[in-house]
Amino acid sequence: MKGASGAVKKKPQVLNEAGEAETAVETVGESRKISGDGGFGSDDGGGGGGGGSGESILREIGDDRPTEDGDEEEEEDEDEDDGGDEEDEEGEGEGGQEERPKLDEGFYEIEAIRRKRVRKGKVQYLIKWRGWPETANTWEPLENLQSIADVIDAFEGSLKPGKPGRKRKRKYAGPHSQMKKKQRLTSTSHDATEKSDSSTSLNNSSLPDIPDPLDLSGSSLLNRDVEAKNAYVSNQVEANSGSVGMARQVRLIDNEKEYDPTLNELRGPVNNSNGAGCSQGGGIGSEGDNVRPNGLLKVYPKELDKNSRFIGAKRRKSGSVKRFKQDGSTSNNHTAPTDQNLTPDLTTLDSFGRIARMGNEYPGVMENCNLSQKTKIEELDITKILKPMSFTASVSDNVQEVLVTFLALRSDGKEALVDNRFLKAHNPHLLIEFYEQHLKYNRTP
């Protein structure tokens, strides 16, 4: 049956008032009337039926269904709103008052085609049966729907681009969308970096400024020294606030200065007294009574507090202590008998020619139990090398090491024994001058 809609439900046949058995067959967008003798009603009256205006309308005696034009308008609205889905006719709601059209055995009325799929290489359509709920929809193969080819063509046309349909393909934005996402991420990272830089500059602006020049008297010297270091680091960070990693470089520079032997020679060792200490020199730029005309610095004897938390490996970074190790045999021979008049705490002379208690981890610093004697300045630096006293040579790791002991004159006028290792670390110019004065050579024949 060409005009009949193929389906899968059974409906009872109904006799109209004239006693004629009519078979109602409807298609989406088309309804035809089949008379008892099997003729179709058409526009031109062909097929054995009477003529009608527009498409033939399925009617029963006493049936008040809307015209075909109204049905077409409803179908157009359904195509626009639901993408090809069709709603039930208005007369469907009045099914309780009037009887359904009669269908042949094995034929069922189709309301709409919902979806399309391909299973095992075969096309299937999801059919909505009129008068049945959505849960009763079934997937029908194309072979079962040959009688409603026009309905299938209309559904396929609704799936084409440019027309509303159930399937809506996702639009591919192309590579430009990825570029936009990358630009957004980049801008976000730049904003975060700018915020971190601004916060760093604000934090650095609150750091303390450089204090006044250091004074070498009293217990506030160590605190001033620490403040000066912190101010130096803060100024370096402010000057390079554009880079977050510059603070680490400033710390490395500070550590390099701690290991610089030349700077340590001018600074001299540090002594702590009740949590505070003093340096022999404030640095290269320190001037005053503590600097002699020959460029050497004076020693400020302080009491060494054993309970001070500053005692430890912090000041052991000095290059002289790491580079030259104390020789036990030399230190035993360097005790001078001329130190009888000193206090019992200061009667030990170390291998470097300076007075210090045995076991003192800061060689060259003089200890005194009485804090009132801190105003007495005793110059203990070596001022002149008098003559060599002994010579020892040793070989370690196939390298010959020579140790020469000299009799030297201290700044207090007393003589002391020192070795060439100490002179290399603390008084290299005196050692070089002595070598130049006593240099001898023989001409080769």
UniProtKB/Swiss-Prot annotation:
Residues annotated as domain Chromo: 108-167, 378-442
Effect of residue 22 to D: In strain: cv. Landsberg erecta
Entries under Gene3D superfamilies matching the protein: 2.40.50.40
Composition skew (Basic and acidic residues), residue ranges: 57-68
PROSITE patterns: CHROMO_1, CHROMO_2
Physiological role: Structural component of heterochromatin involved in gene repression, including several floral homeotic genes and FLT that regulates flowering time. Required for maintenance of vernalization-induced repression of FLC. As part of the PRC1-like complex, recognizes and binds histone H3 tails methylated at 'Lys-9' (H3K9me) and 'Lys-27' (H3K27me), leading to epigenetic repression. PcG PRC1 complex maintains the transcriptionally repressive state of many genes, including Hox genes, throughout development.
Domain notes: The chromo domain specifically binds to dimethylated H3 'Lys-9' while the chromo shadow domain is required for dimerization.
Subunit note: Homodimer. Interacts with CYP71. Interacts with histone H3 and CMT3. Interacts with SUVH. Component of the PRC1-like complex, at least composed of RING1A, RING1B and LHP1. Binds to POL2A. Interacts with DUF7/AIP1. Binds to LIF2 in the nucleus on a common set of chromatin regions. Interacts with PDP3, MSI4/FVE and MSI5. Component of the PRC2 (polycomb repressive complex 2) complex which regulates histone methylation on histone H3K27. Interacts with EOL1.
Designated name of the protein: Chromo domain-containing protein LHP1
Species in which this protein is naturally found: Arabidopsis thaliana
